[in-house]
């Protein structure tokens, strides 16, 4: 599960994404620093960067769905259409997970030697709001000691394929995510 992630506004690529969104959507306010469910944050879509609320609104109005299992997203009614027509990229500088023991320890996971970490996401319009979820799969060795699931991490050469090619998207979610650096926060 991914319930928080980080956006460092000092990274040049992040600044460019924010500038493009502000140009396309004047007056929009997006979160930086630690991003929480329901916050508005940038996503990359086929049509360009856009602001999105984190979490699909539940049909019963009670809360949000913030993650989707990559293994079943294409079949589940909640995510099926978004998988086919609404794949997005969530640009971050890392994500957070906590240990499940009595004394929870918060960790930041980042790509070593990279400033950005791109997570696979799905989006759809709900009540005229662009909403997104983060796709997760089984944790790799870097994350498994802290949590059993992690976001699907996209490499730079996978971004366009993820956004535009459904067959390639299916293959991407089956791949293991790259090793990550873990830092206590």
Where do the language-model regions lie?
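Short linear sequence motif anchored by a di-proline
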Residues: 1-185
């Amino acid at each position: 599960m991914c319930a928080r992630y980080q956006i460092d506004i000092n990274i040049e690529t992040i600044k460019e994404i924010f500038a493009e969104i502000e140009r396309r959507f004047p007056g929009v306010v997006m979160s930086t620093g630690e991003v929480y469910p329901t916050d508005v944050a940038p996503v990359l879509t086929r049509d360009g960067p856009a602001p999105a609320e984190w979490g699909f609104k539940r049909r019963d109005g009670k809360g949000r769905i913030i993650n989707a299992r990559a293994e079943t997203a294409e079949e589940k009614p909640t995510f099926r259409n978004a998988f086919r027509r609404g794949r997005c990229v969530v640009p971050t500088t890392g994500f957070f997970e906590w240990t499940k023991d009595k004394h929870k320890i918060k960790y930041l996971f980042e790509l070593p030697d990279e400033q950005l970490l791109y997570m696979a996401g799905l989006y759809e319009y709900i009540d005229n709001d662009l909403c997104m979820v983060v796709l997760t799969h089984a944790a790799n060795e870097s994350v498994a000691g802290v949590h059993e699931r992690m976001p699907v991490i996209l490499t730079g050469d996978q971004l366009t394929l993820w956004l535009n090619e459904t067959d390639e998207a299916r293959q991407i979610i089956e791949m293991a995510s790259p090793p990550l650096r873990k830092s206590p926060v």
